[in-house]
A protein has these predicted regions:
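Post-cleavage N-terminal segment of exported redox proteins
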Residues: 1-25, 71, 85, 98-103
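A broad, structure-centric signal for solvent-exposed, well-ordered loop/edge residues
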Residues: 8, 39, 47, 62, ...
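Short acidic/polar micro-motifs centered on Gly/Asp/Asn
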Residues: 15-17, 42-47
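Gly/Gly-Pro-rich "capping" loops immediately C-terminal to redox-active cysteine motifs
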Residues: 26, 30, 45-71
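The canonical Cys-X-X-Cys-His
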Residues: 29-43, 94
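Short amphipathic alpha-helical/adjacent loop interface patches that line ligand
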Residues: 33, 37, 65, 76
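Axial heme c-ligation environment in periplasmic c-type cytochrome domains
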Residues: 49-56, 71-103
Length: 103
């Protein structure tokens, strides 16, 4: 019961952090992407190293902002965690920017 309550509170808190539609700073997201993400995911999201998802296709980006935020915070497989490097707002800006890379 405690775990369920904690999960519900965590989800509610994350949604409170979610930006209003159109509130993302795409320019800042692009700058952060170029600095922290492009080496592995490619400058245009086309992929760079084996195991790094391609963002110029929509499969990975069909996930919610909340799910992608959690993945970037914690890291996954070969991707390091960025929770201690970037603020949630910055990660959300990167997510919004990456969504513009889809073909």
């Amino acid at each position: 019961m405690r775990r369920a309550a904690f999960a519900l509170l965590a989800a509610a808190g994350a949604f409170a952090l979610a930006p209003a539609a159109g509130a993302a700073d795409l320019a800042r997201g692009g700058q952060i992407y170029a600095l922290h993400c492009a080496t592995c995911h490619g400058p245009a999201g086309q992929g760079g190293i084996p195991g790094a998802p391609k963002f110029n296709r929509g499969e990975r980006l069909m996930q919610s902002d909340f799910t992608l935020l959690a993945t970037v915070r914690r890291g996954r497989n070969v991707m390091p965690a960025f929770g201690g490097v970037l603020r949630d707002r910055e990660i959300l800006d990167v997510i919004a920017y990456v969504r513009t890379l889809q073909r």
